[in-house]
Amino acid sequence: MSIKEEVESRKTFAIISHPDAGKTTLTEKLLLFGGAIREAGTVKGKKSGKFATSDWMKVEQERGISVTSSVMQFDYDHYKINILDTPGHEDFSEDTYRTLMAVDSAVMVIDCAKGIEPQTLKLFKVCKMRGIPIFTFINKLDRVGKEPFELLDEIESTLEIETYPMNWPVGMGQNFFGIIDRESHTIEPFRDEENVLHLNDDYELEEDHAMKNDSAFTQAIEELMLVEEAGETFDNEALLSGDLTPVFFGSALANFGVQNFLNAYVDHAPMPNARQTNEDIEVSPFDLDFSGFIFKIQANMDPKHRDRIAFMRVVSGAFERGMDVTLQRTHKKQKITRSTSFMADDKETVNHAVAGDIIGLYDTGNYQIGDTLVGGNQKFSFQELPQFTPELFMKVSAKNVMKQKHFHKGIEQLVQEGAIQYYKALHTNQIIIGAVGQLQFEVFEHRLKNEYNVDVVMEPVGQKIARWIENEEDIKDKMSTSRSILVKDIYDNYVFLFENEFATRWFEEKFPEIKLYGLL
């Protein structure tokens, strides 16, 4: 198979949603259809010890939430599909944002009872900003929720995107009978013992079935006729440009409507995209020279071995295990001998990968998030990945001074993952960590204890705003006060931590020569 044929067979997407909309459950059911797992774990079944395949970290299993991004690959219908299951909790939106830089499309999961929720809206905006095509799966139709037209209207008005329902539900909750596939004119019944039913061109039931006289069926057909009368046809170009979202109804937990979605997804989702570099070069996925970028680093995927994995998206060419590449940030050549694919915490050696694939590189501390790797004599770097400005800060220290070595090792590794940000006070050497949300601190404390055997003392600091400095050479010691602490970040850049907006404005007025800026 040529590189072009291999690349065209790749589909790489992230699943985004508000917590509890069913994102991880949908991921599992997709893996079932791909034959990647035999039995789906359930997120909520904590007593049975069955945990979701994509929720591999101990804290995720205990809480039933995703706080890291998992990567899974499976084969389906001649395609290789890469799924990135993103953190559902808003405190980990930075990790999700970076993950969205590594995909070519996204699947938005919506709870039919709740509609568009805050985290869904936030993540959708990121996809829209990047022009990522979005597929919508409206979940939990076996529970009572909003009417289909109400949900479609909410998507269109709130997200400002056109919708095209690919199927239509017959009833919901206790009276949920199934879904009508618009293209094949078939009804997929919700109960397994029923056979697929067929509709003629006028949406009349061809089989003699009791449902003919059911009010839920009659209502569904009337609604579908209204949709048809609108006369809109499915526009794949509008999907690929991010202006239209195909909508699917189903129930991930009941494994219903998932295959219907998956079949349509592989037909319509884009193959791997070209990528822009800082040098304004467009790198095609069909280019023969290898290139890729690191979008995530995860420590302790195997707690027994204290390993670190750098997640790399292949952008062009073919990756071959043992090949020589250049790390563009340092301009150093290295041979990649250890590479892996994922099924949550199950890993398998990767010998070959092409554009669109996500592979793990064993990392001894060489890589940073955003690093570009290239083969041959290429001289470019992909555009930097975004970093968020923290809004919460904590002083942190080891409870037991004898654990200093483990404490510093743990902080170093967890900071390099990008889950928290690291600062050191200029004159006291006090370590301060920053986060977007409180849960990040809780997970940080939990992981230090469980993965590094270190108990920590964490105290809030009064500062809430971080600002970096464009002209560091103009900084003077007197500028650092109790209301504007001067610290250094992990990259040795100067940063002021301010108490509030008033303290920030006061500083800017008193020291107009200092040019401050925030991150995202």
UniProtKB/Swiss-Prot annotation:
CDD domains from the UniProt entry: RF3 (cd04169)
Keywords: Cytoplasm, GTP-binding, Nucleotide-binding, Protein biosynthesis
Ranges for domain tr-type G: 8-277
UniProt-annotated binding residues for GTP: 17-24, 85-89, 139-142
GO biological process: regulation of translational termination
InterPro entries in the cross-refs: EF-G-like_DII, EFG_III/V, G_TR_CS, P-loop_NTPase, PrfC, RF3_C, RF3_dom_3_sf, RF3_GTP-bd
One GO MF term attached to the UniProt entry: translation release factor activity, codon nonspecific
Taxonomy, superkingdom: Bacteria
Segment forming the signal sequence: none
Subcellular location, principal: cytoplasm
Locations listed in the record: Cytoplasm
Keyword Nucleotide-binding in annotation: yes
GO cellular component: cytosol
HAMAP family noted in UniProt: Rel_fac_3
Its job: Increases the formation of ribosomal termination complexes and stimulates activities of RF-1 and RF-2. It binds guanine nucleotides and has strong preference for UGA stop codons. It may interact directly with the ribosome. The stimulation of RF-1 and RF-2 is significantly reduced by GTP and GDP, but not by GMP.
The family this protein is said to belong to: Belongs to the TRAFAC class translation factor GTPase superfamily. Classic translation factor GTPase family. PrfC subfamily.
Name assigned to this protein: Peptide chain release factor 3
Lineage: Bacteria, Bacillati, Bacillota, Bacilli, Bacillales
Gene, per the UniProt record: prfC
